Amino acid sequence: MKIGIIVAMDKEFAQLKAILSNTETEHFNHKDFVTGRLGDKEIILQQCGIGKVNSAIGAVEMINHYHPDLVISSGCAGGADTSLEVTDVVVATECAYHDAYCGDEVAYGQIIGMPARFKAPTELIEKALSLNNLPDCKDLHVKAGLTVSGEWFVNSREKMQQIMDHFPEATAVDMESCSIAQVCHIYQTPFVSFRVISDVPLKDNKASQYYNFWERIANGSFEVTKQFINLIQNPSLIHNS
């Protein structure tokens, strides 16, 4: 099975590259890709850059060149749900844009001609949630819910509340997952967003949790992605909901 993992930043890239074996670097169309192994799976890892355009370009290049069975948007995200804590994990049941408006004829966040929300395969959500019950993941908390994406680093309670006014059920917020989900929808490639929570803006002050995450906590926190991938077995079982 071939799995593509897309992250935005170099810190996330370094964390995830460390869980791979037999790595090699390849360069195509201004993008670097690292290929490697994780157990019996072939992994293609890419640092796409921050934001929707960078991530969409990265997803297109990955799908066109490597044809993965599954694409995962990984790295970190802000927690929209105040019950979350730093290093918890959110697997997105669906993704939406929090900064798109195409008029009252469609839902807020919906691009005309596209679904209002991009849903992940139910089987992958169940696999991710099953991590909560594994003996060697006893300190782990995985939660499923809506992830919203937009061109904004959410570093204030005020901005987070503005997003929640439109998406009160949002669980996490990032800058890439929905654009990758849209590309995968168009290219008919299974997709899931699986993100480690770096901060919870509604419980934070001036992104102090976020910076503390990278300074003190991040090392090893992406091992959970390895655990998740190990649970994914048969690509034929992955269907879009």
Enumerate the language-model features and the residues they cover:
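N-terminal short beta-loop-beta anion/metal-coordinating cradle
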Residues: 1-60, 65-66
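Active-site-proximal beta-strand elements of phosphoester/diester hydrolases
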Residues: 43-48, 146-148, 194
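Alpha-helix C-terminal capping segments
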Residues: 61-65, 83-84, 181-190
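Proline-aspartate-enriched helix->loop->beta-strand connector
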Residues: 67-72
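Mid-sequence, gly/pro-rich, charge-dense loop/helix-turn segments that line enzyme active sites
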Residues: 80-167
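A C-terminal functional module that forms or caps the active site or interfaces directly
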Residues: 152-202, 206
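His/Asp/Glu-rich mid-to-C-terminal helical/loop segments that flank catalytic regions of hydrolases
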Residues: 201-240
